[in-house]
Amino acid sequence: MPALFAAVTAAILVAAVVSICVGKYAITVDDIRAIFAGKEVDDMTRRVFLTLRLPRTIMAIIAGVGLGVAGSVYQIIFKNPLASPDIIGIAGGANLGAAIAIVSVSTSSMFAIASGAFWGGLAAVVCVMLLVKATRSRSTSTYVLAGIVINAISKAIIMALKYFADPENELAAMEYWEMGTFGNTTLSKLLSILPMFLIGLIGILLLRRQIELMSLSDNECRALGVRLKPVRAAVLAFSTLMVGSIISVTGLISFAGLIAPHTARLMLRRNNSITIIMSGMVGAFVVLTADILARVLYSAELPISILTTVIGVPILVYFLCTRGKETA
């Protein structure tokens, strides 16, 4: 297992170097070494590295780790292999918040769009929690159904906003944001979401033992001393903080939170707290790879969700086939 973690870590580092190097303005490995060594480098190269490529690469790693960890956690606590970061309405709420900001504030105000996305995702999860509380049920299926309801409401409002939006500016901005991109990443945006991301990630890692036990039935969890209600609420709060901060900068990224946990389980042949960590690492590699392909496959940069979907579908098909053989 240490060798496997070392191999995945090496793959992430290689992908990170490639991510820094590729683009319209080429940066070589020697340039990267010179910058880190404090040697003399062309001003344009240094500026592109520090203000564009490095923040973008770090943001891609953060997004992959966050979505992978959140997807793994959701699949465990909801006991649903199809659970992903949008299962409880985070993605739908963030999308709605961004759409409202685009229509009401400005299509060019990235701060307003990012803020709208974050608070929209947070509000969606609060609505899910209130809906679950109103039903007086704490079963995992209730959380999933509440998330579906909130997502449906969010999509309906977004469709209405699109119908009345300016087709040349607002509609195009909404569609582009929904497909996800790292092209708008800056150092200031990265630093602004880093504390929220770290709080969410560290919180989940501290609870990983309780999360692992939650793969058992509720009665078994209680017998083992797991306090289901507070632990589940804490996990949802931490994951919302983490995923919401990511989506607020990158827009929606499809499939990453779904395929990373499945790939991690296929690699480790188990489903425990170690899988949560591996899911984050796999997610980082997948998103980094998708971002690299988004920049090199076409003259114009492709939306990130197109690439994560292209990468994710074959993995899910393979998972479906292997599950079918196991149950046959």
Task: State the predicted function of each range.
Residues 1-328:
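Alpha-helical transmembrane segments in inner-membrane proteins
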